[in-house]
Amino acid sequence: MSKLGISSLFKTILLTAALAVSFTASAFTEGTDYMVLEKPIPNADKTLIKVFSYACPFCYKYDKAVTGPVSEKVKDIVAFTPFHLETKGEYGKQASEVFAVLINKDKAAGISLFDANSQFKKAKFAYYAAYHDKKERWSDGKDPAAFIKTGLDAAGMSQADFEAALKEPAVQETLEKWKASYDVAKIQGVPAYVVNGKYLIYTKSIKSIDAMADLIRELASK
């Protein structure tokens, strides 16, 4: 092949590569697939935050079929980080306290929040099942002790151990971080998935687990 032919071929390859990159970059669109938060969640680099509530039916559905598989596909680039929304549900505050304690227990034990042995996972699905499947309401806000007991029994933790753990600095720090949940949740409700604390995924635009994982990867690389 002549030098001219080689040069032409090389230019064609470069153009094809450039078009491929351009196509990939335009696969997702700000305003359609995601938005940039005006008020980013601090200290959230390399994370996939899920804002959720025990009282949210769609949070339950996503946790059963979407959150785990998606998180598994992107675990090499972002760490799954749940944020419980205290302002939703009669026992939002108590749920946040139970979840914060159990998440920190799992982390200390080196247990994934998706593992069958995760105390957080056990309590979370116990609340989901009780609230959404069994329609349990724990006296509509009048019996917080009964609500807390549901989660602790599922996790295998005593009330005394829970109360002691709740005072730990790491748990209080988690609860403080979760206060950012409200500003995110009021945009499109929950569940709300946020990448790197900056990019809120529009759940209505999610087409599949693979597409969601691709979007997360793209946003995480920004």
UniProtKB/Swiss-Prot annotation:
Coiled-coil regions listed: none
What InterPro entries does its record include? DSBA-like_thioredoxin_dom, DsbA/DsbL, DsbL, Thiol_disulfide_DsbA, Thioredoxin-like_sf, Thioredoxin_domain
Provide GO CC annotations from the record. Answer: periplasmic space
* Keyword Signal attributed: yes
Q: Which UniProt keywords apply?
A: Disulfide bond, Periplasm, Redox-active center, Signal
Taxonomic lineage is:
Bacteria, Pseudomonadati, Pseudomonadota, Gammaproteobacteria, Enterobacterales
Q: What does this protein do?
A: Involved in disulfide-bond formation. Acts by transferring its disulfide bond to other proteins. Part of a redox system composed of DsbI and DsbL that mediates formation of an essential disulfide bond in AssT.
Q: Which organism is it from?
A: Escherichia coli O6:H1 (strain CFT073 / ATCC 700928 / UPEC)
Compartments where located: Periplasm
Highest taxon of the source?
A: Bacteria
Family of the protein in this entry: Belongs to the thioredoxin family. DsbL subfamily.
State the Gene Ontology terms under molecular function.
protein-disulfide reductase activity
Q: Where is the secretion signal located?
A: 1-27
Q: What is this protein called?
A: Thiol:disulfide interchange protein DsbL
- Entry's induction text: Expressed from a tri-cistronic operon that encodes AssT, DsbI and DsbL.
| One Pfam family this sequence matches | DSBA
Disulfide-linked positions: C56-C59
Quaternary organization? Interacts with DsbI.
- Identify the residues that the record assigns to the Thioredoxin domain, covering every copy: 28-221
